[in-house]
């Protein structure tokens, strides 16, 4: 049975209601059947429509343009041309995609006839529309399987390379992948079981570029524009293609227990140990005198948690991490915060974006609250009634400052508190703001005033 939406209803192919009908529980139950409950490699032909893939291609180009203009190498952008990794990326970033270019036009301008490959990790940080659409598509499967230990990550692949620049390789243990193939060209994935992938003495087993002798022992999967490809964890694999294509790999990221214990310790350090460069002196004290370590221990910002043991502290870190994942629809990486300081008018409509939900809880410290918004933990003080406001926003109904302030008992400061809260939530992409006609008129007037001032100057 096809789950493609009725063409007559699909004025906006990326409408969230359409995506929900298209990738509903029945679709994902069929996915689980085809993949043997996510244990078998499989191509899913009943996927995205051509219109949806074209829109997603545009979103990916916009991501590449944003990275090229603002972030550049900050988020692990890698480029290969004619089989060689490019170390100096500034000339490439200067040729970023333009708004009026499709993927064929841009790649012809940026690369000509050369073979190239781009890999960008943490793709979920960038395009809000692409991340939102993918989150809605994936929402049912997360309810079925639970939250992966370290959530969901995206890797963006763009290129016309003959084969993956990484050679025959395995991804990190515990990462099973759902590949959204956006085309336009097809791609073929070769997959090996450990016992079938036999390397010669002295031959590299991981990142093996000696591909030809091993293709016959691999399982081959070819997928086309709009199709999905699923690969379980811990598989040797290699992607090959002759034509240009874009792929969005969604990773369900689980970890082994030892590695995740290390991750919790890393998070404990990041949250509780501020940077310091104070130099220590040689310790002249007797062997049992540990007083010299006090300046070191005082660096830890534990406040009223100093008497807690290691395990309770790490459990607290894990709970915060879970709240972050659930507030971000499972995404491992939070979106890039907005930099504009928005002025929310009294009649502007404010609401959350589906399928994201904020989480509010009372901090153990009296009068303190924590709000988890799109993976970011925000701590607030003296905000009785905050839980009610978050619950109302999570309902998805647009609300004004006055309506939200009416939920608080503090009549004098309610509107001021709500306006501050909404500005913080907007900064971390927890809410969207639809300006009222009055706000739009003021904004238009400001633009005219700035234009006249600039002209006079």
Where are these regions (language model features)?
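Active-site region of the double-stranded beta-helix
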Residues: 29, 33-34, 50, 69-225, ...
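Generic detection of long, well-ordered alpha-helical segments
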Residues: 50-57, 124-135, 307, 311, ...
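Histidine-centered metal-chelating micro-motifs
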Residues: 228-229, 233-238
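Residue-level preference for the first positions of well-ordered beta-strands
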Residues: 41-43, 117, 228
